[in-house]
C-alpha cells in the first residue's frame, strides 16, 4: 500500500486495525511513525497525529514516544509546525478555520523552574502563531480543559504527550473517531484503535 502511495497513485491511504506487537519492529513506537518513516516525501519534520471527531479532535505533539522522552521533544518549532499543519488541514479539507487549544506540560501549566516548558517553548510558539492570525489559545491545564463548557469552544486540542489528550478523548467519545496522519503528501486514515485479539473471529465486536 505504501509503495502505491509513494508512486503518487493516490492521495489517501486507509488501513484497518493493525497489531503493533505483531507488525512493527522495535524501532517504531507506533503505526503513525512507521507510515511517516516509509513515506518517500515528507511535508513535516515530524509526524502529526490527529485523532479526529467532528465535535472535537485531539493531537499528541510527541505521538507515541515514551514518557521519559517527552520533555526533550517539546520545542517551539515542533509546536508551530504541528499547529500549522492541523490548521491547514481544517481550512483546506474541511473548510473550517479552527479554534485550537494548546495544553501545557506541567500541572497547572507551571513549576518552580524559570526555564520550564511553558515559558521556554509553548508560550513563545503560541505567540508566534497568533501573529499569523491562527486561532490558537493557551497554554491550558489538562485537568480542566476537557469539561463540557470548554469543549464547545474548540475544534482541536493539542497536548504534549499521548495519554494527556487520548485518555480524556476516549472517555468522552470512546472509539467514535478516525486516526489521521498529517505531514505527508497523502492523508493516512485509520480507525483509532488496534485489533481486539480476545474477540477476534467471534463476531462479537460492535
Regions found by a protein language model. Give the residues of each.
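Anion-binding alpha/beta catalytic cores of soluble intermediary-metabolism enzymes, centered on
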Residues: 1-205
Amino acid at each position: 500500500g505504501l509503495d502505491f502511495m509513494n508512486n503518487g497513485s493516490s492521495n489517501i491511504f486507509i488501513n484497518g486495525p493493525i497489531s503493533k506487537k505483531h507488525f512493527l519492529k522495535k524501532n517504531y513506537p507506533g503505526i503513525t511513525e512507521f507510515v511517516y518513516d516509509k513515506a518517500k516525501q515528507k511535508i513535516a519534520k515530524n509526524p502529526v497525529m490527529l485523532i479526529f471527531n467532528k465535535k472535537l479532535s485531539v493531537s499528541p505533539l510527541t505521538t507515541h514516544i515514551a514518557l521519559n522522552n517527552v520533555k526533550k521533544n517539546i520545542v517551539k518549532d515542533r509546536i508551530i509546525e504541528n499547529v500549522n499543519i492541523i490548521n491547514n488541514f481544517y481550512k483546506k479539507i474541511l473548510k473550517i478555520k479552527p479554534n485550537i487549544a494548546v495544553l501545557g506540560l506541567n500541572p497547572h501549566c507551571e513549576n518552580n523552574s524559570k526555564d520550564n516548558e511553558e515559558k521556554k517553548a509553548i508560550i513563545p510558539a503560541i505567540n508566534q502563531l497568533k501573529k499569523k492570525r491562527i486561532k490558537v489559545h493557551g497554554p491550558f491545564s489538562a485537568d480542566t480543559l476537557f469539561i463540557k463548557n470548554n469543549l464547545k469552544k474548540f475544534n482541536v486540542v493539542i497536548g504534549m504527550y499521548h495519554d494527556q489528550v487520548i485518555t480524556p478523548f476516549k472517555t468522552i467519545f470512546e472509539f467514535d473517531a478516525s486516526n489521521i496522519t498529517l505531514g505527508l503528501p497523502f492523508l493516512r486514515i485509520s480507525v483509532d484503535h488496534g485489533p481486539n485479539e480476545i474477540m477476534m473471529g467471534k463476531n462479537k465486536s460492535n
